């Protein structure tokens, strides 16, 4: 899919949610899709962009069909970094309410930081590293990824009154602390 084609399609879709990750139980695409079914009632033009690949891809696509959400969910597997970055930049909320699956736990949430660079706030899960990358209720929200109502209400509260705009602005400021130049200066000051 070309960048122009995607951009013209996205012009009519809002709000825009995005996940960039492996299709893996721990990443919790299922709960986002189930929440999307309810969000669609209030926001009929909502779209969920899924970028990635993995073992759960077919199960996730089957769930989208089962819930009749094919016009709300866009899948991208093998795309250029330019297209990926453009899709992130054109999104409103980065969504990855990770959970603990078996013994697998989300590490530091670099994907949340990458989204924040574009001024995109995140919804992350309470389990794992999301809270290291998301300042709850300032740069995004942390929810219980195991609880569908919490995933839904967290997304709804970010969308309502376009709260994601304020959270995104804060996220862009917050992420600047992860930039190498600042880290190097901090170490120089400590060592001197």
Regions found by a protein language model. Give the residues of each.
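Conserved donor-binding/catalytic core segment of Leloir-type glycosyltransferases
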Residues: 6-27, 33-36, 49
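Conserved donor-nucleotide binding/catalytic region of nucleotide-linked donor-dependent transferases
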Residues: 6-8, 13, 43, 155-173
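Nucleotide-activated donor-binding/catalytic signature segment of Leloir-type glycosyltransferases, i.e.
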Residues: 14, 61-79, 83, 93
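A short, well-ordered alpha-helix in the C-terminal region of glycosyltransferases
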Residues: 45, 150, 163-177, 186-189
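Acidic donor-binding loop of glycosyltransferase active sites
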Residues: 89-104, 120
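Nucleotide-sugar-dependent
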Residues: 99-113, 131-132
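Short hydrophobic beta-strand element within catalytic cores of glycosyltransferases
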Residues: 112, 117, 121-124, 134
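Conserved acidic donor-binding segment of nucleotide-sugar-dependent glycosyltransferases
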Residues: 135-137, 141-148, 157-162
């Amino acid at each position: 899919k070309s960048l122009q084609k995607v951009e013209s399609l996205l012009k009519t879709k809002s709000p825009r949610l995005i996940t960039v990750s492996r299709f893996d139980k721990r990443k919790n695409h299922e709960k986002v899709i189930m929440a999307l079914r309810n969000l669609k009632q209030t926001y009929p033009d909502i779209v969920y962009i899924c970028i990635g690949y993995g073992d759960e891809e077919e199960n996730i696509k089957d769930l989208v069909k089962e819930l009749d959400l094919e016009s709300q969910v866009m899948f991208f597997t093998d795309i250029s970094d330019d297209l990926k970055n453009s899709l992130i930049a054109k999104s409103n909320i980065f969504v990855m309410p990770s959970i603990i699956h078996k013994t697998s736990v989300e590490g530091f949430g670099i994907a949340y930081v990458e989204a924040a660079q574009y001024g995109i706030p995140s919804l992350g899960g309470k389990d794992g590293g999301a809270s290291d990358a998301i300042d709850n209720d300032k740069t995004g929200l942390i929810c219980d990824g195991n609880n569908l109502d919490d995933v839904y209400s967290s997304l709804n509260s970010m969308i309502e009154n376009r709260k994601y705009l304020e959270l995104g602005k804060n996220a862009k400021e917050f992420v600047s602390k992860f930039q190498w130049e600042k880290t190097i200066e901090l170490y120089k000051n400590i060592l001197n």
